[in-house]
C-alpha cells in the first residue's frame, strides 16, 4: 500500500541525509 511506500521512502531519505551530514 501507499503507507508502505512512504515508509520505505522515509527510511531511504533518513539514510541519505545521514550520509550528507557525515561529509
From Swiss-Prot:
Instruction: List this protein's GO terms for biological process.
Output: defense response
Q: Where in the cell is it found?
A: Secreted
The tissues where this chain's protein is expressed are given as:
Expressed by the skin glands.
Coiled-coil segments: none
Per UniProt, the keywords (alphabetical) are:
Amphibian defense peptide, Antimicrobial, Secreted
Looking at the UniProt record for this protein, which Gene Ontology cellular component terms does it annotate, in alphabetical order?
A: extracellular region
Q: Which family does it belong to?
A: Belongs to the gastrin/cholecystokinin family. Magainin subfamily.
* Summary of the function given for this chain in its UniProt record: Antimicrobial peptide.
Name under which the protein is recorded: Magainin-BM2
Protein's organism: Xenopus boumbaensis
Q: What lineage is this protein's organism placed in?
A: Eukaryota, Metazoa, Chordata, Craniata, Vertebrata
Amino acid at each position: 500500500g501507499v503507507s508502505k511506500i512512504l515508509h520505505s521512502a522515509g527510511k531511504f531519505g533518513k539514510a541519505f541525509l545521514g550520509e550528507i551530514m557525515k561529509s
